[in-house]
């Protein structure tokens, strides 16, 4: 029998709570309060009501005819549980490791960022996020507590417990946790990488009345603080002075009487290549659920024009999340994601064909287009009479610059990727109080199609006399499985114990086909297909298979909410490493003392939490070793015929395998050890939060290619060896203040500071005389050899430039 109930929801100050959810528990029957906090609902006799609102603690009450309900402010931030990996969690105030927590993602998602990496920018001490050129498809770089590897500080992203899983949409993010110290990241072992671990928790299906939400964000982006190259007049004066000082004759191209445009500024190249980029994000989410069955469906569309001309990035994403409670012990969950990604990108960093670098070197006297025929401009004169008179097109004024607008407009680099991820979880809980078993299986399938057309380039200083099309597609299959047993319980109200045991396994393989075409008679966009190429060459390639297995254990103990100890251990077996050396152990230990809970600490409203903590841990960097390192790999099977696919009749694929690098049976992964000392302080009724940390991170067994005394005639590359050590020491400070002005207005202010000293403590290589050698990076840049090098005792990748005594300020100083 049903009945109609009425009621009013207010806060502790007696003010109405507008929009509070009132739900008949176990059903989808519900409503929300009006502007006066009132509600009316038809429910079953004896029904249980669930009343909730953001920022307030939820309540469950038996339905009555007339109800007055007072919601209290939610103090869950004090009891907020921070996910630490593999189902383990700990109250934020009880943490003994150094982690950064972002729970205000609803605010962060409205920032003008196009990636999850961008959401982290400026939010956490010791976490540095930098953009990768103006290309909208470029993923920002993340460095946590300093660079520790020559092979890149790759960060491991773990989404809902699955390493490497995609994030359907930034709007789907519920919280982000950054494991900054090795003690917290050690539970991920060699997968942690040199950069650290970022844990993302997404929104899930939940119980409640059907709800439909739509979020949209629009904005613009501009490149700021751009480099200001010399104008044409300044470039001409610089050339005149440099040649005069060297006692040389000025080239004809820099003689205004012969090349009349060389001293006239006609193009601001930075202004030409950059634009105001428009971006938009749309997200639609539908949630419906009961106590036993809940479903959430979301769709997202993101589009970013990019701040560089003729670039874009688009994402379409569909996600389904469902939870099915079969009985009081067993729950099955499913998370299914489909992502479609399209982009048009451009090289931004290469020494000659990087669009931004080219704009810096392109003379200001050049034009984007030749005014006579509309072709792409250079620095040669457009007047044929001058060329006829002087017999030159003044290539010496052009140098080796490339028209950057040609790179942006005529080069056609297009990428389309489609991927599907499915994660199925089985949870069996509380058959024994506190005991839970979780089994998870993830499968992913990815297809990519890539196309890059490079036209003929006729700039006199850096020509490219042939065109080409690179086209490849690949398929990636991967699976991961995890089985975890956890036990959490409290004894005698003082002894809290948490135990975790887990095993994981993963497998990865990629197969692809690459075809290159060249000598296109017509470069029109509708003819940029391999069938129009003069000739083609094809390659078949395989990456993997790669397999890894891990064993994990974790033990946490706390006494009387004052003393906290946590120990973890992980052993990784890596299929890509030599058999005799394919495993490693990654232990960690943390401790914390909550001084504010001691009997001798006076109770007051000023200091709410005072805690000191210490941690030590070890992690590895498996990503620094290629998938096929120890195995002979399939040769790139190829054919080259006149504009045809597949070998001619009677011809076969090449089908042998080979080792391209000398194998080192003792090779192991790069390893980092780090210790951390920290203080956490909450004051003024938890409105002020302060965290201070000092850390020392040592990365050793760095992986480098052996180049010293390696013979070039052996036919294979030098073996990889473990040598060298990098230290990062630093201090971090994180501070935030949150408060309410009234029931409708609140504010939050935060700031952070970090100082890091990076040093190569052991270079690993030695010169013939026994002195420490140097790492010289990846060669030169625009004919400048090794502009950055690494020496023992110096920071990683330091600039090595020509020393000067300063600039002459007057003719008298020159004399």
Describe the predicted segments one by one.
Residues 1-319, 324-326, 331-333, 339, ...:
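Short, small/polar-rich motifs associated with maturation and membrane association
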Residues 92-93, 187-189, 208-209, 223-225, ...:
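Switch/connector loops and helix/strand junctions flanking conserved nucleotide-binding motifs
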Residues 154, 280, 315-317, 321-340, ...:
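Extracellular/periplasmic, surface-exposed regions of secreted and cell-surface proteins
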Residues 209-211, 355-356, 360, 773, ...:
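An aromatic- and glycine-enriched ligand-binding surface/loop that stacks and positions planar moieties
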Residues 213-263, 514, 628, 738-815:
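Conserved small-residue
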Residues 245-265, 279-281, 352-405:
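Acidic, glycine-rich flexible loop segments
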Residues 343-362, 763-769:
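Low-complexity intrinsically disordered tracts that form flexible linkers/tails across taxa
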């Amino acid at each position: 029998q049903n009945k109609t109930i009425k009621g009013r929801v207010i806060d502790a100050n007696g003010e109405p709570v507008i929009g509070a959810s009132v739900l008949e528990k176990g059903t989808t029957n519900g409503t929300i309060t009006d502007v006066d906090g009132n509600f009316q609902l038809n429910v079953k006799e004896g029904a249980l009501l669930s009343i909730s609102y953001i920022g307030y603690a939820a309540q469950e009450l038996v339905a009555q005819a007339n109800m007055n309900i007072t919601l209290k402010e939610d103090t869950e931030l004090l009891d907020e549980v921070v996910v630490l990996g593999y189902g383990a969690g700990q109250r934020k105030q009880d943490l003994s490791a150094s982690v950064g927590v972002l729970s205000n993602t609803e605010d962060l998602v409205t920032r003008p960022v196009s990636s999850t990496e961008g959401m982290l920018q400026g939010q956490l001490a010791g976490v540095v996020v930098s953009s990768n050129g103006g290309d909208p498809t470029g993923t920002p770089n993340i460095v946590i507590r300093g660079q520790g590897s020559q092979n890149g500080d790759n960060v491991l992203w773990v989404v809902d417990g699955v390493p490497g899983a995609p994030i359907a949409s930034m709007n789907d993010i519920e919280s982000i946790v950054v494991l900054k110290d090795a003690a917290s990241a050690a539970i991920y072992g060699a997968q942690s990488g040199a950069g650290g671990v970022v844990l993302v928790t997404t929104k899930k299906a939940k119980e409640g009345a059907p709800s439909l939400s739509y979020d949209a964000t629009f904005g613009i982006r501009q490149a700021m603080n751009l480099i200001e190259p010399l104008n044409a007049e300044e470039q001409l004066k610089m050339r005149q002075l440099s040649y005069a000082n060297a006692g040389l004759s000025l080239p004809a191209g820099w003689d205004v009487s012969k090349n009349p445009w060389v001293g006239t500024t006609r193009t601001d190249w930075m202004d030409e290549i950059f634009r105001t980029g428009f971006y938009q994000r749309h997200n639609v989410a539908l949630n419906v659920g009961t106590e036993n069955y809940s479903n959430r469906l979301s769709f997202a569309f993101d589009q970013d024009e990019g701040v560089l001309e003729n670039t874009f990035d688009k994402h379409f994403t569909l996600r389904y999340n469902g939870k099915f409670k079969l009985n009081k012990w067993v729950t099955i969950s499913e998370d299914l994601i489909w992502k479609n990604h399209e982009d048009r990108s451009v090289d931004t960093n290469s020494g000659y064909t990087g669009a931004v670098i080219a704009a810096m070197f392109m003379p200001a006297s050049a034009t984007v287009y030749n005014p006579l025929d509309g072709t792409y401009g250079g620095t040669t004169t457009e007047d044929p009479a001058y060329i006829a008179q002087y017999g030159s097109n003044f290539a010496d004024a052009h140098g080796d610059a490339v028209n950057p607008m040609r790179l942006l407009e005529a080069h056609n680099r297009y990428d389309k990727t489609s991927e599907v991820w499915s994660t199925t979880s089985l949870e069996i809980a509380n058959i024994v109080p506190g005991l839970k078993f979780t089994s998870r299986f993830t499968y992913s399938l990815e297809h990519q199609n890539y196309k890059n057309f490079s036209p003929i380039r006729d700039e006199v200083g850096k020509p490219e006399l042939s065109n080409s099309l690179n086209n490849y597609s690949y398929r990636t299959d991967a699976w991961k499985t995890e089985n975890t047993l956890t036990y959490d319980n409290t004894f005698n109200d003082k002894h809290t114990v948490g135990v975790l045991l887990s095993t994981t396994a993963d497998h990865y393989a990629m197969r692809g086909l690459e075809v290159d075409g060249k000598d296109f008679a017509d470069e029109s966009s509708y003819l940029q297909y391999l069938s129009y190429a003069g000739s083609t060459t094809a390659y078949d390639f395989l990456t993997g298979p790669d397999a890894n297995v891990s064993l994990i254990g974790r033990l946490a103990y706390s006494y009387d909410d004052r003393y906290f100890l946590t120990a973890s251990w992980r052993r990784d077996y890596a299929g890509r490493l030599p058999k005799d050396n394919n495993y490693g152990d990654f232990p960690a230990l943390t401790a914390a003392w909550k001084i504010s809970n001691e009997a001798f600490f006076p109770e007051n409203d000023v200091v709410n939490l005072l805690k000191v903590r210490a941690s030590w841990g070890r992690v590895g960097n498996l990503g620094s070793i290629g998938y096929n390192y120890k195995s002979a790999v399939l040769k790139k099977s190829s054919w080259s015929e006149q504009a045809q696919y597949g070998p001619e009749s009677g011809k076969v694929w090449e089908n042998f395998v080979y080792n391209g690098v000398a194998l080192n049976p003792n090779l192991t992964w790069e390893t980092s050890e780090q210790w951390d000392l920290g203080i956490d302080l909450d004051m003024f009724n938890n409105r002020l939060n302060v965290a201070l940390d000092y850390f020392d991170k040592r990365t050793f067994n760095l992986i480098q290619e052996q180049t010293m005394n390696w013979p070039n005639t052996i036919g294979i590359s030098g073996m990889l060896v473990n040598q060298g050590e990098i230290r990062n020491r630093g201090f971090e400070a994180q501070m935030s203040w949150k408060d309410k002005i009234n029931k409708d207005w609140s504010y939050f202010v935060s700031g952070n500071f970090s100082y890091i000293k990076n040093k190569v403590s052991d270079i690993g290589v030695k010169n013939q005389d026994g002195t420490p050698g140097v790492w010289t990076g990846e060669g030169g840049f625009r004919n400048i050899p090794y502009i950055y090098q690494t020496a023992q005792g110096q920071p990683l990748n330091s600039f090595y430039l020509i020393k000067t005594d300063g600039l002459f300020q007057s003719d008298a100083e020159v004399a």
